[in-house]
Amino acid sequence: FLHPEFIIQFVHISCIINWSEETKGNVKAKIKELNEQFEEEKGVSMFGTSLGKQWKTYDSDERYSTASLRFNSADIETSIRKTEVVFEPTETGKEYTIDQMGDGLRSLFYISLVDSILDVEGQMVREIEIDPEHTSFNRKPPILTIVAIEEPENHIAPHLLGKLVGNLKDIAGKNNAQAIMTSHSPAIVKRIDPENLRYFRLDRELLASKVRCITLPDEERMQDQYKYIKEAVRAYPELYFAKLVILGEGDSEEIILPKYWEAIHGNTDVSGISIVPLGGRHVNHFWRLLNDLEIPYITLLDLDRERDGGGWGRIQYVLKQLIANGYDRNVLLNTTDSGILTDAEFEGMAGWNVSAITAMQTWIAWLEKYNVFFSAPLDIDFMMLEQMGDTYKATLDTREGPCIDIAQSGKKERITKIENDGEIHSEYETRILKDIKNTLKEEGGDGHTYSPEQQKLMVWYTYFFLNRGKPSTHIAALSQLSDEELKENVPPVLQRLIETADHILKGDKNENCAS
């Protein structure tokens, strides 16, 4: 029995011996000869070829571009046990070992190694089928291998995750393997077909996890909706990890809502809020998906009063989607004055008088009890302009802004000057009528439900939001304001939405139902 200290000293002494060049040359030649003999063995060659091929699909780092099997020992038994993989950028370049890799590349290589083994096992099966008496290996491969990977995002760089997911899909496509991966990373989730996802959520009452499939519209009957929802959940995978999802119309909501929330309650990421733009389309499918996953949500839609399909049409659309999503029709359509709407009355809602603004506002307030809010009277861009128009105008320099030609003076005047002077120009009145049309679209109304000030604001709406990029306009305006100034300038509907979101996150409001 040798004391460990003696062994350590012996190894240390052997490492500092001044070996002759002849001895080092002879050993190197023998090892090279041994490696060549080793690589000629059919089973080794098969595995080495597979390893090199599979590794190229995982990594693109030039230092480790070529992977091959090598060993270094005095006898065949020990050599085989000490077989290792080496990497080299070229045939004559420096060799690297696994130990010299970072954690991420090392993790990636181990997965590549599993991929190689599965590939070889497939070749083993074919060998057994062709000639069972002469095979490269003396064992039968397993019928099925389950490859389970836990949260690879912890060790693998983001730019390599896509390659990893692609290769795991290839592994899962093999006849002898199944791949299972857990992840909290949106970068991974968005690369997985929603139909292949299984969603785990902790049930705090049962103290156990519930497992669910992802609910998508029926592909056969609703092909367009199926494609839209499928791509939407892939584009916004953050919703799976959210404590609360806010469904908005588009890019503007993604800029404005976080800005106000952060001014009032802090970072949306810390709060666990995900804002998903759905463009007002297929809202009931999003609701069904989030209901099935038991993720609470709030919806913010444009009212689009006097636009085609807006106003009463938009309210009717939301009511229909709520009914389709399982809400009680008799409760939803119960009015204070005349009881429950008949089918005929409900079907005719889109044609109700758009000037009945008080009645429309009553329905809007009712739908807020179902966590459906409206940017009124038009959309969130117009609402922000109405709330803090001067802030948006302050982002322009003296050479910017809408202008018109004044026939009387023969000059081009800026709208800002005309508004400040208070002079009446027929050209200005004509411009207002033109931009009312631009704002409400070709099939829209004449703007009679809007006040004179709101009609004038449509000139600025056209300039800021129809002729320029919405996100950049909002960013430029909101970045001028401090958190305190933002708090003082919250549109009332956004104030109510934020309060509702806060109550849901604190657990003191029923989620997605009238209370």
Which residues fall in each region the model found?
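Beta-sheet entry/capping signal
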Residues: 84, 144-146, 178-180, 196-198, ...
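Switch/communication elements of ASCE P-loop NTPase nucleotide-binding domains
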Residues: 80, 87-235, 265, 472-515
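Switch/connector loops and helix/strand junctions flanking conserved nucleotide-binding motifs
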Residues: 2-4, 188-191, 206-212, 306-315, ...
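Extended helical coiled-coil dimerization/tether regions that scaffold
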Residues: 8-147
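Acidic, Mg2+-coordinating catalytic modules of nucleic-acid enzymes
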Residues: 232-247, 251-515
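Short beta-alpha junctions and helix-cap segments that line functional grooves
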Residues: 54, 71, 167, 183-185, ...
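P-loop NTPase switch/coupling surface
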Residues: 1-12, 57, 61, 265, ...
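Glycine-rich phosphate-binding loops of NTPases
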Residues: 1-29, 95, 220-224, 322-325, ...
